[in-house]
UniProtKB/Swiss-Prot annotation:
Binds 1 zinc ion per subunit. One of its GO terms (molecular function) is zinc ion binding. The gene is htpX. Gene3D superfamilies: Metalloproteases ('zincins'), catalytic domain (3.30.2010.10). It comes from Nocardia farcinica (strain IFM 10152). This is Protease HtpX homolog.
Length: 295
């Protein structure tokens, strides 16, 4: 299990290096380093704001409401037990009043974390499955995945920004004074840069989902319960998907399961989530073939 975690971490690091290399390549198209510096500062600034406000943005998009222990005693008990086992602070708990079954965690660190379940997921999971899902979400917080996704987003935004600058610099002049990019550079950066950056950013998201599955199952000691929950969520999100609205699609990477109906999102390469079958297979491998009462 620890070998799988090391591999996930190494993959994430490699993807970050790839994004950084894209920035270097895109920036090399310009002889004026001011352009590169401005693009980096803008991207880092925007993503820093998103990082510090990630909880409010996500909770508002899902119309999530804070709940007390009297309103959600089972959810509180499970999260408190898991947080205590992990020696981490108790996060704030929310419920989103939607039938679409899903859950997510947000917040820049364990002391500013929030965990949200939809009404739909609370209706379809038994307590053991809910515990497994909450373990997965808490693992996102403990693994600092909001920070990782913010860094990936910032790097991808730099590449996209440089691509736009390259396009306009190439289209409207600047080559003759020795400060603009070559036409070949314009084509390469403006066409391929954003696509490559997006693919790498999504690959980071998928890698972190695998790691949250692994470490969440390790926290609860029940990988088969998470596998069972994912099976139910795969069916449930197809029967009751979220509407593909911009504010919801922007938060879809936070969800434990892709919240949109198949066919409304891009193909596997452009997905924020790994294939359910692969996630379930890995969890069953962790369980070592034990049935645990789940199929």
């Amino acid at each position: 299990m620890h070998g799988r975690g090391y591999a996930n971490g190494l993959k994430t690091f490699g993807l970050m290096v790839g994004l950084s290399a894209l920035i270097v390549f895109a920036g090399a198209m310009f002889r004026n380093t001011t352009i590169l510096v401005v693009a980096i500062l803008l991207a880092v600034g925007m993503n820093a704001w998103a990082y510090f406000n990630s909880d409010r943005i996500a909770l508002r998009a899902m119309h999530a409401l804070p709940v007390s222990e009297l309103e959600a005693p089972v959810m509180y008990r499970i999260v408190r037990e898991l947080a205590t086992a992990a020696r981490q602070p108790m996060p704030r708990l929310y419920i989103s009043p939607t039938n679409a079954p899903n859950a997510f965690a947000t917040g820049r660190n364990p002391r500013h974390a929030a965990v949200c379940c939809t009404s739909g997921i609370l209706q379809i999971l038994d307590e053991r499955e809910l515990r497994a899902v909450l373990g997965h979400e808490l693992s996102h917080v403990y693994n600092r995945d909001i920070l990782i996704s913010s860094i990936a987003g910032a790097l991808a935004a730099v590449v996209s920004g440089l691509a736009n600058l390259a396009f306009f610099a190439g289209a409207f002049g600047g080559r003759g004074n020795g400060e603009g990019p070559s036409m070949l550079g314009v084509l390469l950066v403006s066409l391929l840069g954003p696509i490559a950056a997006t693919l790498v950013k999504l690959a980071v998201s998928r890698s972190r989902e695998y790691e949250a599955d692994r470490s969440g199952a390790e926290l609860t000691g029940d990988p088969l319960a998470l596998a069972s929950a994912l099976r139910k969520l795969e069916r449930g999100t197809q029967a009751a998907p979220l509407p593909p609205e911009p504010q919801l699609t922007a938060q879809s990477h936070l969800m434990i399961a892709n919240p949109f109906r198949a066919g409304e999102r891009a193909a596997r390469l452009f997905s924020t989530h790994p294939p359910m079958a692969e996630r379930i297979a890995r969890l069953e491998e962790m369980a070592g073939g034990r049935s645990g009462g789940y199929r």
